[in-house]
Amino acid sequence: MITVNLESDGVDLPEIDGNWISGICENILTDFEHSEAALTIIFSTDTKLRKLKKEYFSVDMLTDTISFNLEDKGEAIDGEIYISLKRVSENAKTFEQDFDKECKRVIIHSVLHLLGFDDQTSEEKTKMTQLEDY
């Protein structure tokens, strides 16, 4: 079973289709052969994500999303995805996209990280960008 919960931390939940979010998360996880998952998507602030980035990755910078898989072993994913609404809004302006589309892209990107995809090299970035067009 796959469950997706939306939460907010210091911000109002964005007006985004929760059914779409649940559906796309379930589709991605199922396509990559994960039938057991619990995802919590937490919409938050730049301050919170910067703090998490510094604490867990030793990098002091703004970021649009951070993903944590809390499950150590097995096929099940117990994931927390933190999303900075301000970064998503800034990204949308930079990439000339509407907020909704950019928010959806960031959610897909975050789920891919939970599945083990990375974006540190140019090859990895290219692969993730292709998969973001889910």
Regions found by a protein language model. Name each.
Residues M1-K104, L115-Y134:
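An acidic/histidine-cluster motif and surrounding catalytic segment
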